[in-house]
Curated annotation (Swiss-Prot):
Name of the protein: 2-C-methyl-D-erythritol 4-phosphate cytidylyltransferase
InterPro entries assigned: IspD, IspD/TarI, IspD/TarI_cytidylyltransf_bact, ISPD_synthase_CS, Nucleotide-diphossugar_trans
Site (described: Positions MEP for the nucleophilic attack): R160, K216
GO BP, sorted A to Z: isopentenyl diphosphate biosynthetic process, methylerythritol 4-phosphate pathway
Entry EC no(s): 2.7.7.60
Site (Transition state stabilizer): R17, K24
A Pfam family this chain is assigned to: IspD
UniProt key word Transport: no
Taxonomic classification: Bacteria, Pseudomonadati, Pseudomonadota, Betaproteobacteria, Burkholderiales
Gene3D superfamilies from the UniProt entry: Spore Coat Polysaccharide Biosynthesis Protein SpsA, Chain A (3.90.550.10)
Organism, as annotated: Paraburkholderia phymatum (strain DSM 17167 / CIP 108236 / LMG 21445 / STM815)
Catalytic activity annotation: 2-C-methyl-D-erythritol 4-phosphate + CTP + H(+) = 4-CDP-2-C-methyl-D-erythritol + diphosphate
Function: Catalyzes the formation of 4-diphosphocytidyl-2-C-methyl-D-erythritol from CTP and 2-C-methyl-D-erythritol 4-phosphate (MEP).
Pathway the protein contributes to: Isoprenoid biosynthesis; isopentenyl diphosphate biosynthesis via DXP pathway; isopentenyl diphosphate from 1-deoxy-D-xylulose 5-phosphate: step 2/6
Amino acid sequence: MTSRLFALIPCAGTGSRSGAPMPKQYRTVAGRDMLHYSLAAFDACSEFAQTLVVIAPDDQHFDARRFGGLRFAVQRCGGASRQASVLNGLHALAGFGAHDDDWVLVHDAARPGITPALIRALVGALKDDAVGGIMALPVADTLKRVAPGTDNRIDHTEPRDGLWQAQTPQMFRIGMLRDAILRAQSDGHDLTDEASAIEWSGHAPRLVQGSLRNFKVTYPEDFDLAEAILGRGAAG
């Protein structure tokens, strides 16, 4: 049986660092909710069986009418952490016919610069891979390590050779990712991305070149950059 493709977008976070009065995935960027751009990118990839959005059980901001015409499903099964939300989402995918050998692409709603071309590039690079992998960018900036207990004084410069900045989507087999997260949880680890769980299980995910436009909107000033990128795309 040919493995199918599913997308999972965890949206249960509060986005506290963004300085917004609401979760950042619902803030307006270039005329649309930030979440819209991720949903639209996966909707444009007809090869996906389903896109599942995981929101908090008490989410008062999500309104499906704001994403009319896009193909996706919603589950109010978000957990206390990203890892918990992703795990709950993986379990929920079974209700949409997903099997352990199917692929899931986990994507941050706070990366509205994702495009169908980037998604397809990731799938094309990994569809025959034994482990899976993630979208990422080689580190271009010089990295400084801060000395502990100082007022942000440099301790030393970190060599950047071989360092990559993780992005999303992160693409793994549903069963492998679920079991890896469960193993990390049982060992007391709350990991910040899916690749970390796979690594914890002893596997080596592959890195696939991403794009600067696929950056994560985190701080208040990031919204202006996202507005410029996405607004330019709409104008074109």
